[in-house]
Each structure stands twice: as C-alpha cells, then as structure tokens.
A protein has these predicted regions:
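C-terminal alpha-helical cap of glycosyltransferases
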Residues: 407-427
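A short, well-ordered alpha-helix in the C-terminal region of glycosyltransferases
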Residues: 394-408
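Active-site and donor-binding regions of nucleotide-sugar-utilizing enzymes
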Residues: 113-215, 220
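Conserved N-terminal ligand/cofactor-binding loop architecture of enzyme catalytic domains
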Residues: 66-144
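Acidic donor-binding loop of glycosyltransferase active sites
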Residues: 324-337
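Donor-nucleotide binding loops and adjacent catalytic segments primarily
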Residues: 243-325
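Short hydrophobic beta-strand element within catalytic cores of glycosyltransferases
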Residues: 329-331, 347-357
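A nucleotide-sugar donor-handling region in carbohydrate enzymes
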Residues: 198-264
C-alpha cells in the first residue's frame, strides 16, 4: 500500500525534508509526526478508493461524481480513483461486437426510444450473457486490482458485483468491497445483492430487508437516509416570493399559476409529447435532456395555440433551480428523479406498467407507501391526476409527506466508508 500523509494533516512543509543532512531529515520527520499527533490525536493515511461506475442511464456516474465531490470537499483520507467499468470490459462487450454499440449505449437507446416493453425478459437475457463471460470479467478485473492495489472498492453498478467481488478476493484478499445501491430496492436475482462477503449501503428499509434476507450480517448492511443527490440540491438558497415570481416570468410563466416539471431522465422520452398534449391548460417546464429530436418536436407542437405557456429545455445542470420554480413533478419512477423531486418538496406523478423498467417498479410502491404522490397505470390519465393533485387539501397532504423525508445520504456515506476502511463499528 502506498501510504501518504493526508493533505489536511500537513503541518510542516515537506520540502524541508529535502535536506542533505540525513540525521536532520530524520529529526524533521519525527517532529512532523509528533506535531500532527499532538494537534489531531492521530495521523490519517490516504487510502486508494476505487469508485466503480458506468454510464447506463446516467444515474451511476452522477452518484459517483456527487460522492467524490463531497469526499474531496471534506478532505476525507481517500485517493479517489473513478473507474468506468464499461471501458475496462470493452474488449469483451458482446453487444458491441454484434451491434457496434456498447452495452451502456444499447441501454440508453432503449430509454430514448421507449423500447422498454419486455425489459424483464431482456434483463434475463443480459444476465445470461454476463454469466457466460463471467470468468473473463474476473480475469480483467483481477489484473486491474493487481495493478492499482486499492484499499477500498466502492461499486455503484448493478449486475457485475459478483465478478467485482470474486476478482477482488483473488487479487487483494481482505480488501473491503462496498456496493451502494442507487436504486431504492434490489431487483433479484443477481442485480445488486449477491451472496458474497462484502458491505452494502442501502437507501431504504426495503433494500436493507432484502440484503438481510440474503444472509448478510446486520453490521455489513448499512442504512443511508435515501439516494445519493448532487450536493447542489443542498446548496440552493431559498427563493423569496418576489424572486421566485421574477424567475418564473423570465421563463415566460405566470407566477400565480401552478407549474409542473416534466422530466424523463437524461434521454427524455417520447411520452412527453403526449403529456404536453393532454395538459393544454397547465404551465409546464419540459426537460428533454440530450434528445434533440424530441426537443424539436415539442417546440413545433407548442407553437400551436395553448391555454397555458410552456418552457422547453434540453440537457441542463440546472435541475435544482427548475425544481425550485415548479410545484409538482411528472416523470418515470426513476430513483434519482423521484428522490430529487421529493427533496425539493414536489409531489410526484409517475407511471408504472409493463413498459416500466423492472428495477424501477418498486419505486412506484415506495411513492404510494410514503404518500408523496400519485401512481398511474399510464399517462393517458395525467390530466385527471394533475387536477386531483392540485386540490388544496390533497396537495397539502402530499407536501407534508415530502417534508417527512430527510435525505442526507451523500453526506452520510463518506463517514460510513471511512469507518469500513478503519474497521470500526459501522452498525
């Protein structure tokens, strides 16, 4: 293990140790450690942390980035190295060999086109392919671990945790593996939770129950208060009444009329056209993500007479700001979007049906259980749902339910990782 002194423990300039006098150099090293211990009580050594993610859907990279940002701001004693699993496994990507597209690109294309009917069967097929190439995955990962020599591996990806765990036990026995679920619950088998020695960080009671039900000890199943959100959500200054009204006017919206935020992830979704058609008398902020074709179609459609204005946006990093200007959320039951909306106190309207990704179906159950919104069979019912949600008593109840959710997972997880690394009690 390459041991360094953490930056925030550097009380003596290390350049002073570049002296020709070896004895003086040794005395300065001793002085450095004595001073650090006297001031901090301990020396924190920087440990190499491999943060495993990929770009299927975008939420995994976003969670990894948010976690890294917070740990670096807090000067946690980790040398954080993001690792894109797709890039490591590119040489054996059977989907790329057959179609010219990476596995993550196939997934993103499905989301963009709405080709999600039958996705449970597709996932079963994907698991068969993953198992078929399991040994090769393990060899590639094992070589990577031997080269980079991590002190802690943190996985933010599903499907591949068995290969990650097996390869790590071979290359670096005793190195902890922590899987952070970026879904509200697991979708067994072989999605997030595997039967192998490791830690899990779960953002819901349901996920904790699933991990414990798989035989994992209580001290290996750690509870965070929700999904990982960007720290920007916590940094947004509240808007005053006049400030919020002015910001709405700048988007061409009426400050005195409710606004719905329509968001279907980074790729958008064609169903947004249908939602906009069915809500001609509702003000909407429509976020299209990277889907330029969808944006063009929405802009063309909204040039037709409407009884209420809309604002159309492409890919943006200003989701927290747009959520501040909205009163409710409409979208798919993705764990990230739901969690962001609830954090911003927006009641949600989501759908759940045969087209819903299987790993996202429990999220609709969670919405109902927590009382934070309305779940539809399909968005043909969206007009009635918006009318129901905006009834004063109903809206107040949903808002109160969102306020009961106190999600600070992105700040809790670094402490949990540090305790795992230190071998201290994390239960």
């Amino acid at each position: 293990m390459d041991v360094q002194v953490a930056p925030h423990a550097s009380f003596v300039e290390l350049k002073r140790l570049q002296l020709g006098d070896t004895a003086k150099k040794h005395r300065l090293i001793v002085l450095f450690f004595v001073t650090a211990v006297a001031q901090h009580g301990t020396i924190e050594m920087v440990r190499r942390l491999e943060l495993v993610y990929f770009d299927a859907g975008g939420g995994h990279r976003a969670a990894a980035g948010a976690l890294r940002e917070v740990m670096e701001r807090e000067h946690r004693p980790f040398d954080i190295q993001p690792m894109n699993l797709q890039e490591l496994l590119d040489s054996m990507d059977v989907f790329r060999q057959l179609t010219g597209l990476r596995l993550q690109d196939v997934y993103n294309l499905m989301l963009k086109k709405g080709w999600t009917l039958g996705s449970p069967q597709l996932m079963m097929g994907m698991h068969l392919v993953i198992r078929r190439f399991h040994r090769k995955q393990v060899r590639l990962l094992e070589a990577h671990w031997r080269e980079c020599r991590p002190d802690l591996v943190v996985s933010l990806v599903p499907n591949f945790n068995r290969a990650i765990g097996e390869s790590l036990r071979r290359a670096a026995p005793g190195t902890p593996l922590v899987t952070i679920l970026t879904d509200i619950a697991d979708y067994p088998p072989h999605f997030w939770i595997e039967r192998q020695p490791q830690y899990f960080i779960c953002g819901s009671d349901r996920a904790v129950e699933q991990a414990r039900g798989m035989g994992h000890a209580a001290d290996r199943v750690l509870r965070a208060s929700g999904m990982i959100l960007s720290p920007r959500f916590y940094e947004m200054a509240p808007l005053g009444v006049e400030e919020r009204a002015a910001a709405r006017r700048a988007l061409g919206l009426d400050p005195a009329t409710p606004v719905g935020l329509v968001l279907f992830g980074g790729q958008g979704a064609a169903v947004m056209l249908d939602i906009a058609r069915r809500l001609p008398d509702r003000q909407l902020i429509l976020i299209c993500g990277h889907n330029q074709k969808l944006r063009g179609r929405l802009e063309k459609m909204t040039q037709l007479p409407r009884r209420a204005p809309v604002f159309i946006e492409g890919f943006t990093r200003e989701i927290p700001r747009y959520m501040q200007l909205a009163d409710y959320f409409i979208g798919k039951p993705g764990p990230g979007s739901i969690s962001e909306a609830v954090f911003m106190r927006l009641p949600v309207i989501v759908n759940c049906n045969a087209w819903t990704l299987p790993q996202e179906r429990y999220n609709a159950v969670w919405v109902r259980e927590q009382g934070v919104g309305i779940v539809l069979d399909n968005f043909r019912q969206v007009r009635r749902a918006v009318d129901q949600l905006l009834e004063p008593a109903t809206y107040a109840a949903f808002r109160t339910a969102t306020e009961r959710q106190q999600n600070r997972a992105v700040f809790e997880i670094p402490e949990l990782l540090e305790r795992v690394m230190g071998g201290t009690d994390v239960g």
